Amino acid sequence: MPQEFEQIRSADQPLDSEESAPVAGARTDDTVDALDAVLDDIESVLETNAEEYVGSFVQKGGE
């Protein structure tokens, strides 16, 4: 059964935050670009030496 929560807004708070939308969009674009860069780095490492990369995350002999 889904739960519904009532959102309480003050009289000062606008219903639509049109002013903050461009800023949020820019932040999202920056975040997406940064994430893409990290994923590209991981992909290039995996292409060159996947075994060593995965081995760095695996415990050996109870370490």
Curated annotation (Swiss-Prot):
There is a cross-link at residue 63 (Isoglutamyl lysine isopeptide (Glu-Lys) (interchain with K-? in acceptor proteins)). InterPro entries: Ubiquitin-like_Pup. Residues 1-28 are annotated as: Disordered. Keywords: Isopeptide bond, Ubl conjugation pathway. Residues 19-57 are annotated as: ARC ATPase binding. One of its GO terms (biological process) is modification-dependent protein catabolic process. The keyword NAD does not apply. The keyword Cell cycle does not apply. GO terms for molecular function: proteasome binding; protein tag activity. Pathway: Protein degradation; proteasomal Pup-dependent pathway. NCBIfam families: pupylate_cterm. Strongly interacts with the proteasome-associated ATPase ARC through a hydrophobic interface; the interacting region of Pup lies in its C-terminal half. There is one Pup binding site per ARC hexamer ring. Protein modifier that is covalently attached to lysine residues of substrate proteins, thereby targeting them for proteasomal degradation. The tagging system is termed pupylation. This is Prokaryotic ubiquitin-like protein Pup. The gene is pup.
